[in-house]
């Protein structure tokens, strides 16, 4: 009997470690040394962006405008309306364009009433923008290259990127691009489980269908990672846990998880729903880059928390 209790207790501990260790970080934050070049990245599932509130009364917008110091903001589940009674695309641009002159709006739903999808705001030029589309319309991955100016050439590239309404710099500008640090950015919103008040069997079925869709989407993201000529930062709402095949299809062994690398011993829940808490939002980067710090801002403006990382390049 004692032996059986010992085995059960040991198995319980192993399962607990397997479940909670990937949710808790193992590394410690570090302060960049003098001369280290860093980029500050924020990812945030905004849960429809407080779309019924205009900018001055919109908590999400006020947080982005005043509550953090990111160089690049990656937003998922952004919803804007054509009706000026609600939050419009023009409202969003005006509210953040002074702080972030470069942007990428990539909407998976686009009709005569509303737009819904991913948005990137940046202090640096964004070029080579491309959408990775999936069969489910509400989910999308958005790829672009962030061109971080070096001393002496910033004005040239900034002017070219601002003036191009399409993909940004052209192939003829490759000599200019080499004078900059270019990082490929992929921001993601992968398949949701769509859990509601269903019974257990229906929840299992929903999870199974959503998980299969996420794995296929993760393979598409992984293909984009493998084909990148630049170091990458991959962010967003994967809608799956760190133990999942979705996460590992994307991360594999050649990407660093900023939270795991820098936030020793902290529980990394980014989604809170009642008593349920899970880490499903991520900032990953290539091994050529180095996460120095990663924090979760526990602000109550969405059902997700924003995730903020400082990355050396």
Language-model features, listed with the residues they occupy:
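N-terminal, active-site-proximal structural segment of metallo-dependent hydrolase catalytic domains
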Residues: 2-95, 110-115, 159-160, 164, ...
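Metal-dependent phosphoester-hydrolase catalytic domains
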Residues: 5-31, 131, 145, 223-233, ...
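Active-site beta-strand/loop signature of hydrolases that rely on acidic residues for catalysis
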Residues: 39-46, 63-87, 121, 172-173, ...
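Short, solvent-exposed loop/turn elements at domain surfaces
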Residues: 48-54, 195, 266-268, 293
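Soluble or luminal CAZymes and related metallo-dependent hydrolases
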Residues: 52-59, 84, 88, 134-139, ...
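Structured beta-strand-rich core segments of catalytic domains in phosphoester-bond hydrolases
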Residues: 53, 72, 76-192, 295-298
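Sec-exported extracytoplasmic/periplasmic mature domains
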Residues: 65, 69, 97, 126, ...
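A solvent-exposed, charged loop/short amphipathic helix patch at secondary-structure junctions
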Residues: 195-212
